[in-house]
């Protein structure tokens, strides 16, 4: 009898897992946007597909229009259904370049070995991006408490932060040009290569490592530009 109960519990567990696992093939896309606290992992693959697990997996809205893939939750009058709350985990398998990665509303995107010639990373509304990459041109934009962390290599990087946006880039080796702007309450950490063009305003902060041959800095109404060892 005890064994029968255990077997039934195991079957129910498998059924529950299956109900909360969604798999779907995807068409082409070059822009990725994620919302509502959804946690997503990028996985380089030979095909394009998505796998969603977690208690709220069935709530995720997948929309792929005009090469833009959006993952979000539909609006609900029940506040708890408007946020993933750690109950949605997504694995996104891709085989083509993703030109723009954009996180919003506390969503998270992570990935390793994200290697392509150029990529733009945007984070806002407490969204978080954490990537390891090898690229020639990297564009960073963070605002409204968005956080971006990048390690690896890039020839050139363009960083634009405002409204308490944060960029952790000390572990990104840049060999060429680094242009950084940090506005209200924003903070940038960069590893500069040949040149550094830094501009802060309204209490922004830029910390940099490396020994750039040319350093141009401009401060407007406060702010900090400082070299770190």
Question: Residues of each region from the PLM?
Answer:
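Sec-dependent N-terminal signal peptides
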Residues: 4-14
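Acidic (Asp/Glu) and glycine-rich low-complexity loops/linkers
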Residues: 5, 19-104, 108-122, 132-139, ...
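First exposed extracellular module after export/assembly in secreted or surface-exposed proteins
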Residues: 58, 128-131, 190, 205
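Short, surface-exposed interaction patches in beta-rich subdomains
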Residues: 148-229
